[in-house]
Amino acid sequence: LGCGTGNLTRLIANRWPEARVVGLDSSADMLSKAQSDPGSVEWAEADIRTWQPEERPDVIYSNATLQWVEGHDEIFPQLVGLLTPGGVMAIQMPLSWGMPSHQLMRETMAGGGPDGKPLGTEALRIATGRKWVDEAEAYYDLLVGCSTSVDIWETEYYQILEGDDAVLEWVRGTGLRPILEGLADIEREQFLTVYSSRLREAYPKKADGQTLYPFRRLFIVVTA
């Protein structure tokens, strides 16, 4: 689910060549890029929230996608209900809401404009402040009643980054993307000026010039 350009989907297909593997995404542009590389994978354009597979899958796999989808209380049990008996759903999502990099996004949106004024529309600020991924216990409570087993854990990784604005460049492709897309040109520049300065203070370079960036990930493996 959320296959994007299909890199991970092709790895799964190569690992299990006899399986029928379907890559699902809501972006026609992403799927077009995925289809440019021929192979055995089937590609389907659909919304995860309303997706109905042709046949019950043995495995549902999603890597760093479901944090963008609202309504986990409904979607997660719904997905488990699509599995074959004994089927498995494996999910990974970032637990980045409480990290300094993401706290500073919200603070900069709230008061990073001239004279401490907010940036962007109210709707964008609300979306930026929304906590999309809950803590592990909440997902256990949600899934334990609709499955035969739930395995859930967190891992904190440390990225070693290079450059003067290393953390900024890292988050550009993840949590910062909706903000940059939602701001007008002038406000985008104002945001980046303030935000990059705050990031450099929160994540100072080490003695060797590198920057350590810790980030948490939540892993969930559910058996139907």
Task: List each language-model region with its residue ranges.
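A short SAM/SAH-binding and catalytic strip from SAM-dependent methyltransferases
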Residues: 59-72, 95
